[in-house]
Amino acid sequence: VDASPGANDLPGRLVFSTTADEGNSPSERARINKDGYFKSSNAADYVSVDQAQHEFNNNHASNNSLTVRATHSSFAGTGFTVGIKRSSSQLYDIVAFYSGNGTNAYSDTEYRFRGDGSAFADGDWNTGGADYAENFEWSDGNSSNEDRRGISVVLVGDKIREAAEGEDPIGVISGNPSVVGDSDGTRWAGKYLRDDYGTYLSEDYEATDDEGNTVTQKRRVLNPDFDPSLEHVEREFRPEWSPVGLMGKLRIRKGQVTGARWIKMRDVSATVEEWLVR
């Protein structure tokens, strides 16, 4: 602990240092200045820390305000996590991003990730894919985990199979979709009950706020068939599911059945063509 004055943080500061084993030369790791601002040893600027609201203030034109870095070469965790105790709701945002007007840094909302899983943007969503796809289940289950990208498919009830000559396919198994609908990337799709139109059912529950008051809030109704002990495997990694590109630019195996309105764009290789599916 160093209480001696330092540049720009008079009359004193709190410095946290460590030494190597049996060493005598301490190395600074972090410091807090007289105003309660904090910085780590390798940071260029202080950040303000408040019990109710944590802020990282950067008054430089080009420096990053916040950087999250994972340095382990085998990192397999989550780089940035936000957890909110309240049940899923439209009444709060998990993350929001703002732009300013020269004086107010929160003048306009540019991105919102709402507490019910909905996302909003004032501009574009840019992706490397070129088609819109939805997940469908194979009628044969694809138990051999066959690579079926580029195959045209038709519906069999609510499932799919390869299209036969003379049939009108609904789309093509996509290898690089821009958007994938009917995904279950966050949890088992049936974890919460829905009505006939696919909207979540909700129920009242009581919670206690920070002041000790009991408040009534709403949450989704848990499916009694949900088993939290079972590992959730996303449809992306299950062989019985595939993303069917329903519109956009798609790669199709040569010789596959095509729709009457589809337009061939080019040959990608000796075995693959690119078509505009519409």
PLM feature spans:
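Trimeric beta-solenoid/beta-helix "fiber body" segments of extracellular/virion adhesins
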Residues: 1-127, 143, 156-158, 164-167, ...
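Extracellular receptor-binding modules and their adjoining Ser/Thr/Gly/Asp/Asn-rich linkers
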Residues: 36-37, 97-101, 109-278
